[in-house]
Amino acid sequence: MKPILCKAGQQLRLQVDDNYASRDTSSDGWLGDYRHASRPSDHNPDAEGIVRAIDIDRDLSGKAKPDLMPDLADQIRHAAKSDKRIAYIIFAGKIASPRMGWRWRKYSGINPHTKHCHISFTKKGDADSSFFNIPMIGGTA
């Protein structure tokens, strides 16, 4: 079965691409490589072939400065409080999820995610490609 990115992941990536056309994409990704294959990861396809994670390169401006990703990661975190398509976010050694009320807390995984922001999605995002209401990527929230 050919892997496919969940609709919510496709939509979020499209909004980022539309609003930051000159951004660096070298740390972007969605489909797990050999490092992901040996362990559970939302980058690995499930039984239906659906992948529920994206990585967005930190360099949104294409010039490294200004560093906008901390602000975008925080806006995604705020949106996730009401948008049930987002499962969790990892960025700059911190993770946010519903477990702790979407507050940032220390992330102790292997990769601190300093070069990209990781967003994982719930099964609700599999078929839901509705617009993310996030100010830095076209929303008005």
Residue ranges and their predicted role:
Residues 3, 123-141:
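Low-complexity, Gly/Ser/Thr/Pro-rich intrinsically disordered linker/tail segments
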Residues 1-101, 114-121:
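Secreted/periplasmic proteins that engage bacterial cell-wall peptidoglycan
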